[in-house]
Amino acid sequence: MKGVFNLQMKNSTSHRQTLLIEIANAITHGVGAALAIAGLVILIVRAVHTGSPMRIVTFSIYGAALVLFFLASTLFHSLIFTRARRVFQILDHDMIYLVIAASYTPYCLVAIKGWQGWTLFGIIWAMATAGIIYKSIWFQKKGKWSTIFYVIMGWMCVLAFWPLWHALGPVGFGMLLAGGITYTLGALLYSMPTR
């Protein structure tokens, strides 16, 4: 009897910890969504001041994708104990592909431009579309392949090394590189097995 009681206590404590973690996740991702909305407004205002329609469109795509990314994650963590969990978990993972492609959009169409920018833009959005379809249909299967695909998409910018270097300069390119390294480390940590 004592063993059953200990198991029930352990399960109750584990459930409470999971609930607290999911509440914290929902709150932090909700704050991220609010900050992304503020960032979207700032990006649009700055783009409008440049008078460039391409900047307005590309900055809006990036900002809107970031809002959707955090919103999907907030909804997933908020509804984790409901039947809607699976749908929002798939959307949460799909939004990773969307935000990667949207992150490339200003670089491709404002910084690189021309045929190289449009080509990389097409490749990245095709990869994002394929990733979203794959993740939506085969969500539970081969999760490590999704992480590998995320990282490959993230490093596709090496195809446009010189145009990016010339457009961004050493400081801008260094920041892009630092972001890529940080993202890759995050993907590696995410892909590590948990207990």
Walk through the language-model features, giving the residues of each.
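Multi-pass alpha-helical transmembrane bundles in non-GPCR membrane proteins
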Residues: 2-195
